[in-house]
Structure formats: C-alpha cells, structure tokens
Amino acid sequence: MQWLRVRESPGEATGHRVTMGTAALGPVWAALLLFLLMCEIPMVELTFDRAVASGCQRCCDSEDPLDPAHVSSASSSGRPHALPEIRPYINITILKGDKGDPGPMGLPGYMGREGPQGEPGPQGSKGDKGEMGSPGAPCQKRFFAFSVGRKTALHSGEDFQTLLFERVFVNLDGCFDMATGQFAAPLRGIYFFSLNVHSWNYKETYVHIMHNQKEAVILYAQPSERSIMQSQSVMLDLAYGDRVWVRLFKRQRENAIYSNDFDTYITFSGHLIKAEDD
C-alpha cells in the first residue's frame, strides 16, 4: 500500500499539509480499504476538523508548499467544509496468483520434408541359416546319343553315295537308323556330331556331313602317297525330325575312303547337348 493524499477543506486554509499512510490507519483500515476495492464499492470521503490547503498527495509528490494566493481564494469562497477524499492506491503486483497448470498438448504439426540420404551403415552380422525349401519338380532326363562304325572301304561312283555303317557302339533309343545311315532328331535342340575317316593313297578324300539335304561341313584331304586319318566335327541346331547323315562325293572327282575287315577306320557319332525346352 502506497501513501495517501488528504485534501483540505475550503474553509480552512492553514497552509499545512497532512499525509497519512497505512501505518496511520492501522492494519484494520488497510484490510477494509483492500476489501472495498476488491468489492468495487465507491470510495469513501472522510472529514477532518481542519481543512488542508492541498488535495490528497502521495509521499513521493513534490514537497513545494502550495501557493498562498490559491489558499486564500479557496478560504474566501464561502463554500462549506468538505470531507477529505481518500483514494487508496494498490500495487497490483502483490495480487499475483500462483503459477497455473500446464495446458493440454497441441495437435501434431505437419510432416517435414524428407532429409538427404544418410551414409551406409556398417555391415551387419551374418544371419541365421534359412530353412530348407520345398523339393522341386523332378528333372526330365533326356539323353540321345549314337556312335557307329564302318569296316568297308568306299570309292566314288556316278552319283553321291550315303555312308552306311555295320557296327554299333552306342544307339540310345534307336535314334540312328542303321538301314538308311541317318540320325533323326527326336526333339528340337543343340546336337554335336563328329566324323573320322582314313584317306586312300593318291586319291582325294571328299566327304560331307549333311543336314537334311544341305551340306553342313566338309571333310577333305588332298591326294598323297601316304594315307592318314582325317576328322571333322560340328554342332547343329536341329528341329524335331531333322536328319543328319554322311555323303561321299561323286566320281567327277576321283575320291575314296579306306578301311578293311580287321579294323574300324570310319566312325560317325552324335549326341544331344541341350534340348530347347530345358
């Protein structure tokens, strides 16, 4: 509570100033004034026996005396004595309450933009061994192979000649026809073929491996005073039913292949490498 200013009655211009505070009013007055202020009751005007030349003045106001002329004019006006007006001044800071409880949490904000990709982390430890998978479908094992030999020598004639073979080394599923001297592809795929012959002294060796009616590769040796072994091999992409066989060239070029009844000098072999649907 700050000091109060008391104003003199107009009838008495004594030139004196009266100041009073909560210490003069006492604790009871201070509590009463505080109660009246909080209840918004109009201010009370008090009357003193003598008038005070100035109005209510706080202790912190200027200490200069009032103008005597102003005091004299106030006393000669003939107005009745007025009660001094007391206006309490309360420092609001002393009425500050306790700190309130925190309010409820607000709604989550919007998701921010995606940040840049971080650097790769260290390699993790090896995981546990996985369970064994379910068994797969059984493979369809398909093997086709043949190997045949000839012990009879052959000379060129008026026309092309197909080499026939008398001896069978391998003929799986009968894929090589001994009567015609031809291999018939049982399914589409890649096949490998090889041919070995013995040349004849002073004669050419002129033989073709045929794919159907087309010459695939040639086995050739020039005339020589010595006879030697010659070989040729090839891989062919065959469709189902394609035929592969060996053909000797005709007489317009004198040629022959050598063999005898004791040894097998001429052989023709082939087998499936990979079926198309594998």
Swiss-Prot record:
- Can you give the residue ranges of the Collagen-like domain? 97-138
PROSITE patterns tied to this protein = C1Q (PS50871)
Task: Write the record's keywords in alphabetical order, separated by commas.
Answer: Collagen, Glycoprotein, Secreted, Signal
GO terms under cellular component: collagen trimer; extracellular space
Q: Which residues form the C1q domain?
A: 139-259
Cell compartment(s), UniProt: Secreted
Q: Which residues are glycosylated?
A: N91
Q: What is this protein called?
A: Complement C1q tumor necrosis factor-related protein 6
Name of the encoding gene:
C1QTNF6
